[in-house]
Amino acid sequence: MTQLSVQERFSSVRARLEALGLWDADALVRIAPGAVFRAGGEPVETDLFSAVSAPMAVLTAGRYAREFLRKPHALRAETDDAAQMFGVRVPVRTSPRRGDTACIVPDRGFVVTARFENELIAACILLEKLCMTACLSHRIGAPKALSAPLCLMEHAVYRKKYSRPSLAAARGEESAPETREVPDLALRESVIAYGKKLAENRLIQATWGNVSARIDENRFLITPSGVDYDRIRPEDIVEIRISDGSFAAGQRPSSERELHRLVYAQRGDIRAVIHTHSAALQTFAACRESLRTPEIDAPCASYGVSVSKKLAESASGVLRSHDLCIMANHGFIAVGADLETALVRAVTAENAAKRLLEAE
């Protein structure tokens, strides 16, 4: 694994946040303890991150964060991905305290802390989504915050389990991957390609979201759990039996595999399932509101704890008669006769949700 200089790592963070519209002219980035840079790349000494225990941190603000800062307040976790990253809430502080994963700094922006770069970028995206919901949700309803015990549980699971593969990769601790021949190679490569397209279309962040494709009436392929989409190999894609959800020992399929299995079991016409965590649709999910326009019919399924049987049954129940489903406090799912159809439906729904939320 090539070791990048702190300046190269800063440039990578800046380029990625700029591409997402999450870079601010007054941004500060800590690449490592003692290595802090201004937005222009100049090293700077600051006490802002002095209490931060994580190696990386950034002070920045996107469009909705800047709007939110006019009247800042603590942000409660209203979706599972926010709870996993931040816990119960994102507090308002003049500077982050030890143990904070994020905080709102009045008149300056938000601070997020992270153990590795992909986590830093994902946290920035998630916090901007929380700010978007805070700014626009009044147009469709009121967000329903998740309970504190549930948020704490989800945060612990993310830190101790779900993020471990990405953390190991960032630290260079992965063992050399085993290269082996796998069946259905073309379909596996398509699943990987469409996972990357989800990221390119800003429908997911980091390892959240998943993609699957039917092989035949008995089997389907699905993305693995906790692996960044740019690192997934064909042999990482997991084959699952539709009848009972079984898969080969030693593999780690997506934690949402039961939802995909139920969809394939009940609808023979479906050959692809895409699960996203995109910004505008997350606002609908946080408010537990359906999205209905002349072009979109996406009912909201009742809430079920992340990866639970209730979540899978609730969402798959909606998908018996619909091709789109908003998952309360969780995300969105689109199905189709092929991966391209499912992706187009997900992009179209996100754009429709954004137009509705941003309409004057």
Where are each of the predicted segments found?
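Glycine-rich flexible loops
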Residues: 1-360
